[in-house]
Amino acid sequence: MATIDELGCPLSFDELAEALGLLEDTQREALSRRLRAMIRDGQLIRNRRGGYCRVNHADMIPGRVIGHPDGFGFLKPDDGGDDLFLVPREMRKVWHGDRVVAQVSGTDRRGRKEGVVIEVLERAFSSLVGRLHIEKGVAFVLPDNKRIPQQILVPPDQLGDAADGQVVVVAIDEHPTEWRQPIAHIVEVLGDHMAPGMETDVAIRSHDIPVEWPADVFEQIADLGEEVPEAVKQGRVDLRKTPLVTIDGEDARDFDDAVYCQPTPKGWRLLVAIADVSAYVQPDSPLDREAYNRATSVYFPDRVVPMLPEVLSNGLCSINPHVDRLCMVAEMYFDAKGKTYRSRFFEGVMNSHARLTYDQVRDMLEHGDPELCERFAHVLPHLRDLHALYKVLHAARERRGAIDFDSVETKFRFDDNGKVAEVIPLERHDAHRMIEECMLAANVAASRHLLRKRMPAIFRNHEPPSEEKLEDLQQFLAELGLRLGGMPHPSVKDYAELLEQAKDRPDYHLIQTVLLRSMMQAVYAAENKGHFGLALDAYTHFTSPIRRYPDLMVHRAIRHLLTGSKPAEFSYSHTQLQIMAEHCSANERRADEASRDSADALKCEFMLDKVGQVFEGLIVSVNSFGLFVELADIYVTGLVHITALDRDYFHFDPIGHRLTGERSGKAYRLGDRICVQVAAVNMDERKIDFVLADGRGQEDEGVRRGSRRRGRNRDREKRRAGPARDAAPPRGEAASRARRGEWSEEKASATDRDVWRPAVPGWGQPVEEASARSTKEKKAGGKNVSRKNGRKVAKKVTSQRHPVHRGSRSRS
């Protein structure tokens, strides 16, 4: 750096080597490696003449590209500064996820800084998955990743046995430039895009979810048996006679927690026993490195990609009934008001006395089911004690001000052919909440224990809403005659009081949704900043080390203290923990996106035979380009594009979350109920189009005219409006990672409940999450066929009046 600065001009490799006096081949090779690393890290760039020059942070900005399906993008600077807007011309050079150096080129008409890409430091993708299209002898792949809208050319001699329309994996031979499309060759044919399970296969590959286990992991676990060796049980607290039980969903396969409660003179004693994963996964072992690489288990509608091999996740680390298991135990004592007055952690060995489901527990506690009560008579008294403690803890949580947003979680029911037969809501009752309170209590106890001992660890932070979001929220509430207390720094209790005040209003859902969207995203960090949504001064994740790497790290920190070691002697520094926390947060988001993509594809497939049908729905998002509507009872979301609304010019109010007609004054607002007709399903883009079904703009000719215009008008509207700031699809579709909509293992909702960190596009996310579709229609065989980049989408247009399918379920 000093040499380049001193000479004040770009230097070639030979000039640099000479200036540094590096003449030996080994020295030059070392210099070459160092220069490559500095380019990768954004310290240097190499110009087109091969000269190395320093990145001047005054005008050169290294960062990562965030792509948008519509072709534009952003540069997210490494230093956390303001994003740079990248116009489509610049995005032709790069892909979503690439690390680049950009330069500020000016500002657009909205005042945003625009940038030009100077150098690509690191490519994000060496392979991609997508659908193969062959048109007039030209073969190209459309990536499944919608943030990469470019076609990838495949030379004729690289097609192999792949056929038009199949889903393939391609290896990139030439990345895109401003003047050249990317070129690739096919390395794997996944099969027909409608094959059962293909949605998940594609999501796994599109998001680079690790599936295969490295050979050294198999070598490490080869000697693990099905039973815990007697030798490793020594020195642990023996809990095998304590009637600990697991309570999970019916289809759960891995059981990582067990509970036991008993009354005491002051209140209750609660044991939360967690599978002792850290006893088997040693730091920096092959198993540990792969667990860190994955960071989390990924839950899809039809399968799970685990963080740990099955011999551990479903075997030695799963608290199966009537077998000995190693555990890490949180022992907590609560007074009559639910306040913890003593807690400790210890290593134990346990034997689960029963494997219970949520519904079984509910049927015993609420309905007194005689058969179940007799079958589980040996644990029923302790379940009643646990339920009594739950009521006290829940009341304490309400007094604290923690909020619990209403949402509907859903799951898929598949037929014998692996196709979606039904999208059904998951019932959540006191048995779920009872376990949730136990897990929250253990997580809180772990965080306070670590802080009290000044132990370095990974925490789960949820910061208060930003000033900008609060300002928008206040403007919205003012229109409704409401006010959020505690401004300019409201507490979560202020949120809870506002929800209580509004609970009987007809627009309650609207108010709740806007409050939810004002929340920040929960993340992992090495520094504790508290948890706003739970109204806690400290929080961490302790209860799920089978499926979350941060929990495993918390177990290691607690074990370090249990051995009598000093915090300063911990194997991980604060810097290392922060890097690990950021990695885990990123992989958590990746898992959410992959799960959502799979679920979206399945919902589109489910709706294919429903084109033309009419449903009642709820407006769950309003944008400059239209309305997102969630259908009642089946919880599927689609877009009513602005061109399919009444014949009027609609103004978008981002604060009021509404579109208002200029001439008619007709307003469509978040939370309104409307009737829609399913107009089109696009499997390639995983999008569903609706039109109004109540006569307004629904005439046959009007629909056809709107359909013909829809593609170009969508693009025009979004270009005019710029990035949408309020693109949230359905409530009930995973209000958080811990409450993924189609996650069949309900324990997720009973352990974390970061309901303020939605895993749906646009909720607390930048513009790139807001998606819309552009189509161009062509009449064919009595149906309209929209074609985009060679993809055909069936559309049905009908003037027939359909009755409204009103479900019996009332949703508010």
For the regions a language model picked out, list residue spans one by one.
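A generic structural signal for residues embedded in beta-strands
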Residues: A102, V170, V622, V676-V678
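Charge-lined substrate channels and their catalytic hotspots, especially those that engage the 3′ end
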Residues: M1-L271, S278-C327, R355, Q360-D363, ...
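A short macromolecule-binding patch
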Residues: D82-V87, I148-V154, Y635-D653, D700-G706
